[in-house]
Each structure stands twice: as structure tokens, then as C-alpha cells.
Amino acid sequence: MLIPQINKFTRNIYITNAYFLPDLGIVQALIAARQRGVDVQIMFPEISDNIVVDWIARGIATDLLPGGVRILQYCGTMLHSKTMTIDSEWSTVGSANLDGRSLTANYEINATIIDAAFARQMEAIYLNDRAQSREAAVDKWVRRNPLQRAAELSLRPLRGLF
């Protein structure tokens, strides 16, 4: 459902996700969208209620940043949103995180809304949350603590369990 939408649109993709653990297909689609000139921004919590998920998400961000995808870590209170808007036209919101279990095994559901007015409202919320976020800079990201980066890489194979 998501990859065709990511591949179809041309201007922007704004994702907010509490537990950002996408599979390789979604990661590749997001990087390809950025390479086509799409403004791809992903927001997830700086700190969530699951430290293992936080570490895995940062490891995935390490793959996305060099491809030009903007990573924002939300610094406000608890972020539990699961939204995506594309090109001020297409939106999804619901209970499903971008992780394998939410998309295939858990009893999660998202609504897809194709409505420009709704998408603009979703984008306004995203931009408000973005103001409370810290954007990851590629040069600083790659210079993070080597032990932290090693831990993120070693936990990556576990992303399908969450």
C-alpha cells in the first residue's frame, strides 16, 4: 500500500511515526523518492518508551541520511503519531507504525484520505511538531559515538520483531 504511493508522488512526503522500523522496500522507496527530487522528511521520537526501537530507528536513519532524506527527532512530550502526507493530497493516519508487525501481524488499521484540505491540515500539524524537533545533520550523525553506532547496527536484524 505505501510503496506505490511513495513512488507515485513528486513534491513531498512527511512521515511522523512513533516506532519507525520500516522494511528495506520502504527504505529504498524513500531514498528513490528523494533522488527524484521529492522532499522526504521523517519524524520520530528522540526518546520513546522502547529504547531498543529507538536504537534500531537511529540505525535506519543512518541509511536514509546519506540519500538526502531529512530525519527529525521530536524533542517534545511523547510522540505517538502514525501519519503520512504526500504532495498535500494523500494522507494516512491510524494505529499502524511503520514496522513489520504493525503492517502485517498486529491488529492495526490506518485510514487513507485523498483530500487536499485534510492533507493541508495534516501538514500544518506536522510543521508544528517539526518546530519541536531537532534535525539530524549528516556530518554530525556519522561522527556519533562508535559504540552507539555499533549497537544500532547489531540491533538492526531485530527490527522485524517489533
PLM segments and residue spans:
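A short, well-structured juxtamembrane/interface segment
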Residues: 1-2
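PLD/PLD-like phosphodiesterase catalytic module centered on the HKD motif
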Residues: 9-15, 19-162
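Structural alpha-helical scaffold elements that stabilize or flank donor/cofactor-binding regions
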Residues: 5-6
